[in-house]
């Protein structure tokens, strides 16, 4: 059921992309469910066939391995789907990205203005202290 050769090229329209994601989700979950059900059927089956018991056990074990591998493949496909959804949300959520950029730039502007005010205050204090020192130096009798 799970198609092994999925393309990573995304459809252009948002609706088609969401339908594609939904179809992938349904296919992978269906594949996992069907394979799991078949493994359970194999595990409890009492064989009354003409094949020897050893041969039947080997055949059942091989089929279980194949179905387990199909379940793993479907699980990996689901993990890839989750990664694709995360990437889609990160890359196409412009409103949140713009809001975060605006908030950060406003924060940086506020920080810059606070630093500018502190520097101006420090400059003014240093100018006053320098003026006082120069006045003291030039009016001193010890020059």
UniProtKB/Swiss-Prot annotation:
Keywords: Activator, Nucleus, Transcription, Transcription regulation
Keyword Nucleus set for record: yes
Pfam families per record: Med22
Gene Ontology annotations for the cellular component aspect, listed alphabetically: chromatin; mediator complex; nucleolus; nucleus
Locations listed in the record: Nucleus
Biological process according to GO: mitotic cell cycle; regulation of transcription by RNA polymerase II
Gene Ontology molecular function: transcription coregulator activity
Function: Component of the Mediator complex, a coactivator involved in the regulated transcription of nearly all RNA polymerase II-dependent genes. Mediator functions as a bridge to convey information from gene-specific regulatory proteins to the basal RNA polymerase II transcription machinery. Mediator is recruited to promoters by direct interactions with regulatory proteins and serves as a scaffold for the assembly of a functional preinitiation complex with RNA polymerase II and the general transcription factors.
Family listed: Belongs to the Mediator complex subunit 22 family.
Subunit field text: Component of the Mediator complex, which includes at least CDK8, MED4, MED6, MED11, MED14, MED17, MED18, MED20, MED21, MED22, MED27, MED28, MED30 and MED31.
Protein name: Mediator of RNA polymerase II transcription subunit 22
Organism of derivation: Drosophila melanogaster (Fruit fly)
């Amino acid at each position: 059921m799970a198609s092994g050769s999925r393309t990573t090229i995304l459809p252009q329209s948002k609706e088609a992309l969401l339908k594609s994601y939904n179809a992938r989700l349904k296919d992978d979950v269906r594949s996992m469910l069907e394979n799991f059900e078949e493994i359970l059927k194999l595990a409890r089956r009492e064989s009354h066939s003409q094949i020897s018991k050893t041969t039947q056990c080997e055949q059942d074990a091989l089929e279980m391995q194949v179905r387990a591998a199909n379940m793993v493949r479907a699980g990996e496909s689901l993990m890839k789907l989750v990664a694709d959804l995360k990437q889609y949300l990160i890359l196409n959520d412009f409103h949140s990205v713009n809001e975060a950029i605006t908030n950060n730039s406003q924060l940086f502007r506020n920080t810059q203005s606070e630093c500018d005010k502190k520097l101006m205050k420090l400059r003014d204090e240093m100018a006053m202290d320098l003026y006082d020192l120069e006045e003291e130096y030039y009016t001193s009798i010890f020059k």
